[in-house]
Amino acid sequence: MDLSSLLSQIPQDTLLVLLAYTVLGGLYLVVVPLALYAWMNQRWHRMGKLERLGIYGMVFFFFPGMILFAPFLNFRLSGQGDV
């Protein structure tokens, strides 16, 4: 059984729901967490109190996606070089 015949047996409403879940899941687990990482990396030392509070709230809300990328991203400071 090939993919086109399998997809033709599934109702269109079900396919739309699966597409919506995929898009929302991708936004929740990939797009927004990467945007948050980029925003925090760019503005870490210039954030105001309210901006930092909002970013921390979004980190709490998007924590599953943040934890997926945490092992692969390194935002440590460069340091003084060889001492």
From Swiss-Prot:
- What is a GO molecular function of this protein? oxidoreductase activity, acting on NAD(P)H, quinone or similar compound as acceptor
Q: Name one GO cellular component term.
A: plasma membrane-derived thylakoid membrane
Q: Name one Pfam family in it.
A: NdhL
Where are the membrane-spanning stretches?
15-35, 53-73
Q: Which UniProt keywords apply?
A: Membrane, NAD, NADP, Plastoquinone, Quinone, Thylakoid, Translocase, Transmembrane, Transmembrane helix, Transport
Where is the protein situated, by its record's location annotation? Answer: Cellular thylakoid membrane
Give the principal location in a single coarse category.
membrane
- What EC numbers are recorded for this enzyme? 7.1.1.-
Membrane topology qualifier = Multi-pass membrane protein
Reactions it catalyzes: a plastoquinone + NADH + (n+1) H(+)(in) = a plastoquinol + NAD(+) + n H(+)(out); a plastoquinone + NADPH + (n+1) H(+)(in) = a plastoquinol + NADP(+) + n H(+)(out)
Assembly with partners or alone? NDH-1 can be composed of about 15 different subunits; different subcomplexes with different compositions have been identified which probably have different functions.
**Biological role stated in the UniProt entry:** NDH-1 shuttles electrons from an unknown electron donor, via FMN and iron-sulfur (Fe-S) centers, to quinones in the respiratory and/or the photosynthetic chain. The immediate electron acceptor for the enzyme in this species is believed to be plastoquinone. Couples the redox reaction to proton translocation, and thus conserves the redox energy in a proton gradient. Cyanobacterial NDH-1 also plays a role in inorganic carbon-concentration.
Cited PANTHER family: NAD(P)H-QUINONE OXIDOREDUCTASE SUBUNIT L, CHLOROPLASTIC
Put simply, this protein is called NAD(P)H-quinone oxidoreductase subunit L
Q: Which organism is it from?
A: Synechococcus sp. (strain CC9605)
